[in-house]
Structures are given as C-alpha cells and as structure tokens.
Amino acid sequence: MIDSSTNLANTSSNKPHNYHEQSQIDQTVRLREVLKTLPPFVKDYFRAMEPKSSARTRINYAYDIRVFFHFLMENNPVYKNYTIDRFTPQDLENLEPVDIEEYLEYLKVYKRDEDGELITNGEKGLARKMSALRSFYGYYFK
C-alpha cells in the first residue's frame, strides 16, 4: 500500500545527484564555458551533435576546434588581426587545403594559449583533432 503522505519533492533537482548525473552536469557546465571562448556560430554545431555524442566528446571537440581558430589567428596572415568572435562559416570556406596541412603540422608541437605549456600530439592525438575538424566542416558544408 502506498502511503499518501509520501513526499514527491525528492524527485526535484534538490536531491543529491549520483556520480553519473553529477558528471554529466559538470561536463555540461564545462562545455558551456569552452563555448564562450569560440565564435558564436559554433554553438549550432554543438547543439546538432549533442544527441549523437557524449558530453566528454563534445568538450574534447570544443577544445580541438578552439586550437584550430587560435592557430588561424596566430599563423594565417588573413586572420592575424581577428578576434575569435569575428570568425564566420565563410572564413572556413575561404581556407585552402594548404591551411589544413599547415594546421596538421602545427598540431605536432604547439604552445597552449592558457598557460604556454608545450603540447605534443602523436598519431592518435592528431587523428582525433582532425576528426573534430572534419566533423565540424561536415556540419557546415554538407
């Protein structure tokens, strides 16, 4: 028999979260923070990929795509005076294959913007970063 005095309030967002729920919340908050550091149009891509990917994948892709935009601002004369919020899908379309080749070379060893730490990527790291970029381009240029 169900007690009619059972409090249904414990189904609200005030109850403690289990590990998986808390991890999802933390990753969602982290993704939102990373998205603030990317061009505004990029949010559309991440909304579209949400149903087909984990929060962790989206965070990693966001970091990888941010590295790409920073690479363009630091190494491509066309984007030297850009701020990250100025980029548009048209800028991506204007890039040449050599720009992507130079990016791939750059990814082997580069300094992280936040702390200047030297980052190196082996084959797996390069493959993931290029996968993020391919997926990103695929969304905008189907």
Descriptions of predicted regions:
Residues M1-S53:
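N-terminal DNA-binding module of tyrosine recombinases/phage integrases
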